Amino acid sequence: MSDSEVSNMSDSGSEDGSISNKSQRSARSKSRSRSRSGSRGSRSVSRSRSRSQSGHSRSGSESPQRRDNRGKSDESGEEEEEPPGEDIDSEEYDEEENDDHPRKKKKKERFGGFIIDEAEVDDEVDEDDEWEEGANEIGIVGNEIDELGPTARDIEIRRRGTNLWDTQKEDEIEEYLRKKYADESIAKRHFGDGGEEMSDEITQQTLLPGIKDPNLWMVKCRIGEEKATALLLMRKYLTYLNTDDPLQIKSIIAPEGVKGYIYLEAYKQTHVKTCIDNVGNLRMGKWKQEMVPIKEMTDVLKVVKEQVGLKVKQWVRLKRGLYKDDIAQVDYVDLAQNQVHLKLLPRIDYTRMRGALRTTATESDDSKRKKKRRPAAKPFDPEAVRAIGGEVHSDGDFLLFEGNRYSRKGFLYKNFTMSAILSDGVKPTLAELERFEESPEEVNLEIMGTVKDDPTMAHSFSMGDNVEVCVGDLENLQAKIVAIDGTMITVMPKHQDLKDPLIFKASELRKYFKTGDHARVLAGRYEGETGLIIRVEPTRVVLVSDLTNHELEVLPRDLQLCSDVATGVDCLGQFQWGDMVQLDSQNVGVIVRLERENFHVLGMNGKCIECKPTALHKRKENRHTVALDADQNQIRRRDVVKVMEGPHAGRSGEIKHLYRSLAFLHCRMYTENGGIFVCKTRHLQLAGGSKTTVSNAGIVGGLGFMSPRIQSPMHPSGGRGARGGARGGRGGFRVTRDREILGKTIKISGGPYKGAVGIVKDATESTARVELHTSCQTISVDRNHIAIVGVTGKEGSVSTYGRTPARTPGYGAQTPSYTAAGSKTPLVGSQTPNWDTDTRTPYGTMTPSHDGSMTPRHGAWDPTANTTPARNNDFDYSLEEPSPSPGYNPSTPGYQMTSQFAPQTPGTLYGSDRSYSPFNPSPSPAPSPYPVGYMNTPSPSTYSPNTPGGIPQSPYNPQTPGASLDSSMGDWCTTDIEVRIHTHDDTDLVGQTGIIRTVSNGVCSVFLRQEDRSVSIVSEHLAPVLPCNGDEFKIIYGDDRESVGRVLSKDGDVFVCRINEEIKLLPINFLCKMKSID
């Protein structure tokens, strides 16, 4: 139990408790006042006795003498008792008690003498100094210091220090010291008597936070909720204030310029965690609170007054009011009035009547108008003002209207307060400069506000830029930037006499460009685009964009040299490049170019317009939209088509969008509008589509017969054309699906997707729908341009022309019917009058119609074979000879074109034991024409990949007879090459040379220079013109097909050529002369 606790127990009246030190000190003080002249030894004995009594009090015993002293102290009254812990200076407190109680003071005077009074006065004057010196010497606890001749004063000082340590608590000692030095100013203690005269800056140093002050803790907060969170924590603090567990934070700080953080003042981090617990806005800072260093704590609350340094002709913007966000130029600055005189474009409502023209009706109309209607910014027009009743007065060089001053050029000059303008980092756009100045060349683009937060943002210079000095003695000196340090630029001069780097301010330099440089736009309307500089002016640079080939006018400060080419922006918000958008209720368009603020939209009329994103609505398309091309083929999105008529005739492209009778196409070879153009669907032709016309469809569908040239699969178009006639009797233009190729992996060997690999999703006789592996895109491809991966042979090995042998008149004797049954079972051929046994036709008793081995070759299928001469476009021999002929021998079951085509029927492919007809061929009249067409019967031979005339022994891989002849025809033809017409029906054309303009399905459009016209000629009538030394050529065969080069020399059967800066040897027949430029 401590001494103070024992003292408290004795004060409460306990008889058995120990006597407090306070009572002992009171008793000793009284005895000392009565016998102050006692010897040093008596004091030592008293001090020893006091310590022994204190030790006895800790054990709980009490001597009779101490009880007597306690009784004497009790007699003096309870008001004379001192509170525990304040008897550090007993004499000082005794005198205070004497002032309050004269009776005690009289007792002190009764026993005092002259020498004692002097000692007491001396003690009162030097009491603090003695205590201070004693404390410094003994360090408050001086029990182990040897007493080397101590005086009475030294002993008393030691006694006081000992009592201070033994009897008082730490907080009581701290309170005593604070009271003792409270009357002395901090400045006086640190700086002596002259501290009061110190400056405020020096005295403020003493108020800086120290290690004993609360710390600042930085807590992450939700951005924008800093002040609201601080108020929330204040309410939480007040709520917990009267509870058992109040919050231990001292303050909350949410500085104005700090985003995403607040500061809490507290002694410990745990106090901060308790405070921010369950606060949603501080969820991000729950696990991490960063303590601010002591030296940086003052910077949190430091307020720096910004000095506005405006310059004349500096660009600024208005913050509020009618001219909010408008560009303005500083005319002069009035710092005394805190105002700035600006020059800007006025906003005057020329529709509101003024003066005498203002009537009651106009006032009522004005009240109905929107209050915050903002007129357009344009130069002041005095004539327009007078027209609405306004009065314009002249004041020297200015015009006065409604209290405002206008220049003769139409600009408004007006005073604004400093707080109403924004001057930091203002950069006017080129459009604003053109409207702001009558002559843009006079505009000073370099005067603008600087950004104080980041000095590097005050300029757009970067390493390696070419600059020139614009002010000073070295004006017009060209240099190259080698280092940048804030606003200080280090450059290497381009001068023979200057070899050392020079340092300039950023305001003293400007960028320098020359014609032919490749640069990137850093800011403005065309930000991110690259192009080639074609013209340099003092205040602007003109360059051609790499993406659009349009001229761009850019400020020099917004350019930077670069070597790469921009890829462009393909999306902005909800819109992307190539999207179809709704312009109005009747018109649509396609986005062909995206800029920062505007879209370039290609309309239905083929014109490109600029639109704001807010004025457009994205149109939702149906992916199943279908239209008809010029040949009445169905076309849909992603189909590859060719333009046959109109301004874009000859171009090929992919359908991006279909809208009513219009199609938006994308062509990689078209440079304008991003490669997108619009055409009418009736001007298009599907790549690989049918050429069946409406007139032919009617004839074929009704009669079922066509000429051999059209009907025979020898010609690809003929085979496709016969499809309508064969289906005419049962549903007209029904499309036959080729299920045998579905799901197979193929490779495209021609067209715009040459080399692509995909899976066949759907197929007809002429077209296949292929899903590409690379882009998962489904496209339509001509069947002649695909080859099955893993199958040897040329493309077209999967033939569509041989599935119905009856369609080929030349093979009627070899393959009697659609199936092999006609040649194997005579009963069928002799008893079945038609395909279906239940078909009761008037022709049932006629010659068997399906047993082709008993009829002439063409008799069963084409009544015109022996009567009408056929065209000789497809064969070297003549078809005009009467039947029988060497080319068409009706007595021979096979096709006697050449020996390499051995006769074979489709039945042998499927294990037929008898693949020929047992009946000998005999001439018989052709059957009467049937009024309807024929349907394919589902049999294996219907989808036979091998047809007559195409056996594996042939050098042509299994394919249709027509494909075997036409497989190599027209493959070499391409555009912009010179060709010679070696054969043609028109003898006047034979021998002429021309230039191929377009190629479509083996038909070339050739421009004849002699006749100055274009003719359409089948590619088989053309021959390439060989180049000579020095001529440009184009490769027409091989892996490098379509490559362009120049002939250097000829060495036998090869040419020495230069292609892309490489020297190569190429065969003669691989090259064709390109068109010569006259």
Swiss-Prot record:
Acidic residues compositional bias, start-end: 76-99, 117-135
Biased composition (Basic residues): 25-37
Biased composition (Polar residues): 1-22, 814-852, 886-907, 954-967
Bias kind Gly residues: ranges: 718-732
UniProt feature, compositional bias: Pro residues: 920-930
Residues bearing PTM Phosphoserine: 73, 76, 90, 707
Domain of life: Eukaryota
Subunit structure, interactors included: Interacts with Spt6. Interacts with Spt4 to form DSIF. DSIF interacts with trx, RNA polymerase II and with the FACT complex, which is composed of dre4/Spt16 and Ssrp/Ssrp1. DSIF can also interact with the exosome, a complex with 3'-5' exoribonuclease activity which is composed of at least Csl4, Dis3, Mtr3, Rrp4, Rrp6, Rrp40, Rrp42, Rrp46 and Ski6. DSIF may also interact with the positive transcription elongation factor b complex (P-TEFb complex), which is composed of Cdk9 and cyclin-T (CycT).
Family: Belongs to the SPT5 family.
Known role: Component of the DRB sensitivity-inducing factor complex (DSIF complex), which regulates transcription elongation by RNA polymerase II. DSIF enhances transcriptional pausing at sites proximal to the promoter, which may facilitate the assembly of an elongation competent RNA polymerase II complex. DSIF may also promote transcriptional elongation within coding regions. DSIF is required for the transcriptional induction of heat shock response genes and regulation of genes which control anterior-posterior patterning during embryonic development.
Protein name per UniProt: Transcription elongation factor SPT5
